[in-house]
């Protein structure tokens, strides 16, 4: 499996290397660390009405998804031009990135690209 990592502070700089490493794989998994999950505040604010809480949480999730799409747009476009798919996963914090990578590694070999400067150790 090919996996690419990025965050706002650590963008994916090289799209050629993961594409070249695919060896016939049809899907690249892209993981975007959106940092702190501000949606949590929409879930725990006891003074806010339920509708406002849900709207805020949805807004935060939408913002994170838009950031992730923008961060991986060049990779998605390059993958599409080669007939490949890219699955985007938005997670919150380095712990979530580590957990996702650990789970995928239990399923098989994972080659990771990007993530330079991300605190994953």
Predicted region positions:
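Short beta->alpha connector loops
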Residues: 7-12, 92-96, 118-119
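Glycine-rich, Arg-bearing micro-motifs that act as flexible, cationic patches
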Residues: 111-121
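A general secondary-structure junction signal
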Residues: 30-32, 90-92, 116
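Small/aliphatic-rich secondary-structure junction motif
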Residues: 1-56
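A short acidic, glycine-rich active-site loop
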Residues: 51-70
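Aromatic/hydrophobic pocket-lining residues that form π-stacking "cages" and hydrophobic walls in ligand
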Residues: 16-18, 75, 100
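Well-ordered, non-membrane alpha-helical segments in soluble/globular domains
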Residues: 12-15, 68-73
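Structural beta-alpha unit
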Residues: 77-111
């Amino acid at each position: 499996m090919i996996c690419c990592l990025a965050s706002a502070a650590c963008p994916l700089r090289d799209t050629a290397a993961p594409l070249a490493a695919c060896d016939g794989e049809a899907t690249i998994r892209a993981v975007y660390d959106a940092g702190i999950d501000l949606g949590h505040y929409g879930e725990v604010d006891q003074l806010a009405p339920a509708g406002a809480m849900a709207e805020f949480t949805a807004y935060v999730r939408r913002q994170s998804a838009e950031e992730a799409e923008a961060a991986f747009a060049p990779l998605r476009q390059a993958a599409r031009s080669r007939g490949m798919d890219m699955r985007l996963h938005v997670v919150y914090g380095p712990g979530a990135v580590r957990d996702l990578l650990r789970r995928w590694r239990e399923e098989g070999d994972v080659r990771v690209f990007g993530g330079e400067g991300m605190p994953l150790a």
